[in-house]
Amino acid sequence: MSEEKLNKNSERAVTKDTGENSQKIMSEEKKNYSDTLNLPQTDFKMRGNLPQREPEIQKAIFENGLYEKILKKNEGHKHFVLHDGPPYANGEIHAGHALNKILKDTIVRYKSMKGYYSPYIPGFDTHGMPTEKKAIEKLGLDRNKIPVPKFRDTCKEFTKKYKDIQTEGFKRLGVLGDWEHPYITYDPKMEARQIGVFGDMYKKGYIYRGLKPVYWCTDCETALAEAEIEYKDVTSTSIYVKFPIVDGKGLIDTDDTSIVIWTTTPWTLPGNTGITIGADFEYSLVKVNYKNDESKFAGEANSDLNVDDKKQIKENNKKAVDGTNSEKLILATDLVDKVMKLAGIEEYRTIKTFKGSELEGILCKHPFLNRTSRVVLGSEVTVNVDLVEGTGCVHTAPAYGKEDYLQGLKDKLPMIVEVNEKGIQQDGAGPFKGMFYAKSNKAIVEWLDEHNFLLKSEPITHSYPHCWRCKNPIIFRATKQWFASIDGFREDTLKAIETVKWHPLDWGKSRMYDMIKNRNDWCISRQRTWGVPLPIFYCEKCNEPYVTEESIAKIQEIVKNEGTNAWWEKTAEELMPYNAKCPKCGCTQFTKEKDIMDVWFDSGSTHQSVLVERGLDYPADLYLEGNDQYRGWFQSSLLTSVATNGIAPYKEVLCCGMVVDGQGKKMSKSLGNGISPNDMSKKYGADIVRLWVLSSDYEMDVNLSDEILKGISDVYRKIRNTLRYMLGNTYDFDPENPVKYEDMQEIDKWALTRLNKLIKDCTKDYDNYDFKNCYHDVNQFCVVDMSSFYLDIIKDRLYTEKADSLLRRSAQTAMYYILDALTKILTPMISFTVEDVWKAMKHTKNENVESPMLADYPVENKEWDNNEIAEKWNKIIMIKDIASKELELSRADKVIGNSLDALLTITAGTEDYKFLKENEKIIRDVLIVSQLKLVENKNAKSVLKNADKNNVEGNFEIKVEHAKGEKCDRCWQYFEHLEDGLCERCKNVLKQLN
């Protein structure tokens, strides 16, 4: 590189003063002493050009096997295993992936530099509905018209494509790992291990088949787990419906009396078999009078009712004609006024009150079906009746809700499922047969109104579950499914939670604890084909399930060798043990289960299929994912691990938030506010993306926008310039021959105390996963301690002293130590930039020069801890802060051009004057002024008294004048006497050079 280019590039290396002074040196043609100055020299460019440079570094890193070399270096050391939660391989990576993977890479890099053997095996989740849906959409497939093995092969090829795309995306972000051998959930060895986990749980009695309500997506036609549900606000119709009493148990006259229920899901009324009330609540029998002689009696126009019901209605109508236009309603006492007002009923009075428990067993006529609904008592475990909304009388359909199901079990209510897998109402839905459930809502409300069963309807906005993949509303629907019984190991799981270190501690642990304590059994079956089959056979004669240790072992062996396609390609006889017989009836003919395992069972089993299978540590040291994984991967992994081995699969759990845009809105294609990592890397560089992640409060939702990235880029430039300045000024330094600490200049010793603090603080930050604090520590060190102070002050020594002088080498020694440690601290952060810094640096003979990742993380040097120097320099820094303000004002007033043009007079009290006088030369150098004059004022108070507490009391009296004498042509300081335009020092240096 030419000297002219070097000098130009050094202009803005650190501070404004440095730039101005360097420029002036080069611009003065009449007496150009530039060839006598030690100007910075380095191949490390001022501009990073990261989008162009990083791919070159990335190529070299992976071609040279850096990851493998890191593992080899730390072989035999203590392990640290971060187990990767697998992203779905069904699309390109997004900003959330970048946040996740960069956090993981930062931790693994840091641990590796600390000497830990820290393998990182990236994973890919490839099975299940997420992939099926994408493959069907993008390839235009109809899974019902393609043979299962062919459809599965198509899905596999689809996931392979995106696995490769995502791999390149993660590598572009600088993520190191075993990318040649990732774990992929369609890998036959993994599938076989997963089947083994299922077998272990089945053997222990934790797996069962049952008919109960589950989340069901009518679009995807499959059951869903809680982790596959998203909630959105929707507007529904809430209705108040009259159920006429047909058997009052001698307590209530059935004559024109109804119980009023409330529901927001009219489509579930065909499944109603009960009305749940609160045992301890008070209920009122309320007589209501209607205006305008308009009959409101339930069922007046219902032609489908039987003869007795019609007789009752006729009697009611007769009363209406006689002027008795009234009826009686039962609802919770506390809600009477609210409901009457809502229904527009002005005339009503309470006839009688009852305790809820007295009403148990009363029978009501279903509004449009020829059956009765029984009054039952709720509880905290079943239907928990409240007096906040509705009527205190809860519509109960055991087939369509968790609490309803439990209520039905308790009170032996019939479970009637009238909606099929596509969401269509069936024969038992009466007049609504053949309707899609959502459309039947309106039809049911209109029918109830027309037939006078509807007291009131109104819109209500509430949070409602939606499918995570197709984004459509889902329903609760009772179907036969396979479940993992959480009750079987719930207490063990709660105990295991106590053994884990959770981040954030304040709510991470309690969140998981509450989820496990209150969760339902886990529905593990899915009505899809792309996944690991449930390894279950059924007796053709009696339908008894067949699962044995032998059958599991044989399926595992077949799958390991042939993959899970074998389940669909082979007969049951080929898959089962020889001479298998039904344990119940002795039959030897079997059929295979058609469903696959929940995709969360896939990833939730990786503690066995990856950690144990690959000989890694189990439990892992750390799981790190988004906070949505408390109900996803964190939980499924915990459940399968405790169920099979009695322990949590992880020692620590760390979670991050979601990525949102600059205004805090969720990123989405429809809003057009998403920024892809690929686009960010092309525009700004991956190191900027990494700094964005590490500068964020990642445990909360993380904002991302172009403005934020531009701000991060500015910080990056300051850090880069600091590194470049030190590289440029250590070009001729020999690391094998540093200046001993005791021989170093005091300011250089001070710089090393600051470095020691940086090492200490950043080590603590990395250990605590507090990357934001580490980022700020580094930024503060580079901008405040180095660029604005230390490096600005020592430039005179670096440029003008003899190259091998003790003064210059002392500064170089400090800079070398700082550059070395700072580069290593930055290595987990800006992983591309540091590779170039490392190659531009000087190194000791024994140091690995290939990459900073093969170096050890810096440790504190106790020799550099010097409290006396730290306290003294606190005062000097305060003096500089006070004086700099006056110098800036004088510069603005054109009294001086730069600080070297100044004669500075400081008037101070006796105590401060003494300190100033003792350190006069140091302070002059620190202030970067040509001349310093000190004046004592015995009446002035001490300004520096509490400097050790970073507290300045008042100000010095400071006067700024233009310096006296002439300016040295070489160092630009002013002196009373010059010889041939040179000061005494510069003249001596030139003599030595000649």
Indicate where each model-derived feature is located.
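Residue patterns forming the tRNA-binding/recognition surfaces of aminoacyl-tRNA synthetases
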Residues: 2-7, 28-50, 54-56, 60-64, ...
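N-terminal catalytic cores of NTP/NDP-binding nucleotidyl/phosphoryl-transfer enzymes
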Residues: 72-134, 261-263, 375-407, 411, ...
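Secondary-structure capping and boundary motifs in well-ordered enzyme cores
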Residues: 74, 78-85, 96-99, 103, ...
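Acidic, turn-prone loop/beta-hairpin segments
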Residues: 125, 214, 218, 224-232, ...
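Cys/His-rich metal-chelating microdomains
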Residues: 223, 473, 545, 588, ...
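Protease-associated
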Residues: 274, 281-289, 309-393, 402
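C-terminal accessory/binding modules appended to enzymatic or scaffolding proteins
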Residues: 376, 951-978, 987
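Alpha-helical recognition segments enriched in aromatics with Gly/Pro capping
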Residues: 411-423, 528-530, 549-701
